């Protein structure tokens, strides 16, 4: 039988399983994979922590794999304070939204770079908004920031609302939750220094993600709020 090839991975979530094992959700270039790690109190179990770059060998053909081998491939991204809450938020988004065993190699790379940037103390908000947008795009939920639902160009002095199932729609009368065209055009260029861009990005991503996350609150968001 052909030996499965090791692949890079990060731990998204883990919990005790039976007496001495752990049930671990990994993020790999091949997607989110759930596997049983036996003898979790040994050397392998000490590696089952978030933000540690790993190499994992996964065995089995079913949805629930078995960990054949698990090794660290580098130094863990040392996150603390708000950066730690941000990393946990990314993990929870991936656990909630990423389908099992669907390959997303570019998203894996973006996740790796985001962890490194968080550990380096880069400003949190642009990193989080960029990751949220990349996740929406990879899952097929993204929409144009420079054109509205009628294929008209977004104009700086216009007002727009998000129709999650379609995209941005221009409106003539002010109402809560709208976005300025100038803000949307700044987001399209990732111009985080533009007036109002970061706040607009946070509102836009929250609206865009809400329909896919459902009504169950994000634990990481509650922890961040109570910090």
UniProtKB/Swiss-Prot annotation:
InterPro entries: ARFGAP/RecO, DNA_rep/recomb_RecO_N, NA-bd_OB-fold, RecO, RecO_C. One of its GO terms (cellular component) is bacterial nucleoid. This is DNA repair protein RecO. It comes from Pseudomonas entomophila (strain L48). GO terms for biological process: DNA recombination; double-strand break repair. PANTHER family: DNA REPAIR PROTEIN RECO. It comes from the Bacteria. Keywords: DNA damage, DNA recombination, DNA repair. Involved in DNA repair and RecF pathway recombination. Belongs to the RecO family. HAMAP family: RecO.
């Amino acid at each position: 039988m052909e030996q499965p090839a090791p692949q890079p991975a990060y731990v998204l979530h883990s919990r005790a399983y039976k007496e001495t094992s752990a049930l671990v959700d990994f993020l790999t270039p091949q997607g989110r994979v759930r596997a049983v790690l036996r003898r979790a109190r040994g050397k392998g179990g000490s590696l089952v922590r978030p933000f540690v770059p790993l190499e994992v060998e996964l065995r089995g053909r079913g949805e629930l794999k078995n960990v054949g081998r698990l090794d660290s491939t580098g130094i863990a991204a040392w996150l603390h304070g708000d950066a730690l809450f941000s990393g946990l938020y990314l993990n929870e988004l991936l656990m909630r939204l990423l389908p099992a065993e669907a390959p997303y190699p570019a998203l894996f790379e973006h996740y790796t770079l985001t962890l490194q940037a968080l550990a380096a103390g880069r400003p949190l908000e642009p990193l989080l908004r960029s990751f949220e947008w990349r996740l929406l795009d990879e899952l097929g939920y993204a929409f144009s920031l420079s054109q509205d639902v009628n294929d008209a160009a977004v104009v700086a002095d216009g007002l727009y609302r998000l129709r999650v199932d379609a995209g941005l729609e221009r409106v003539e009368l002010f109402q809560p939750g709208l976005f300025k065209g100038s803000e949307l055009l700044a987001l399209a260029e990732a111009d985080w220094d533009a007036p109002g861009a970061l706040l607009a990005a946070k509102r836009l991503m929250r609206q865009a993600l809400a329909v896919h996350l459902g009504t169950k609150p994000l634990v990481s968001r509650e922890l961040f709020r109570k910090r």
